[in-house]
Amino acid sequence: MIRKTVPSGIYSIVHEPVKICFERIIPDNMDPERSVRRALREHMVASADHTLKADELAHLARMAVVNSKKWQPGAMLKCHFLDGSPKMRKKTQAVAHQWEQYCDIKFKFVTSGTAEIRISFYADNGSWSAVGRDALNQTYFPPHQPTMNYGWLRDGTPNNEYSRVVLHEFGHALGCVHEHQSPKFTRKWNTAAVMKYFQGPPNYWSPDDIRHNVLEKYSPRGISATKFDPKSIMLYSFDGALFSDGLGSTNENTTVSKDDVRMIKAMYP
């Protein structure tokens, strides 16, 4: 988001193109828990006020345990850069370590050997990460191939953009999902505007990709969710024109919020 001076001398807000990460959910045919995952995906709903039947709630409660993405609390996760300049690596590493002060997980950056988190800057032009322990699935994330990518971070990228993107992707690596897909997300999308926007640059997504990454919400019992957090690092800045509720844009968050801290501490006490 940038400020632009108009002829009257008053600053107006101009939104740069929204770059958001692509959710890397393992396809059913590559997931050993595919029957559980398929059932969970079928319970994704289009609105947060969907009410599930008692038998659905019980089934989802069981799946939430089987399908957990969390690492073991106290784990030391090895991270390895597959490419990128020394400056890009240094800036990424510094931001990633910020998560450690809030939870019982450590990141160890190594230069050789195996690593749970393998980082690229050139796999494609997008930003994405495996969600939690999905990184261990070698069918979907083969050894020596990235489990995380930063397609637009470069030497000259501002520090606040590194903070925004790296904290977000390492949030995924810890098992967090997008805040705008939480069942507690209260904003109302302008579906036609969303479809038009994300089919264009810089994302070029298909309608199915847009539904999967923006419009759909998880079932209320499919994930752990309390209240919607407008300051969450897992929420991207969306232009107000993408909503039909007239409430303006979502925040441009570059640091973890108080609720992010509380949630990650609960995940990894």
Model feature map: region roles:
Residues 1-269:
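Zinc-dependent metalloendopeptidases
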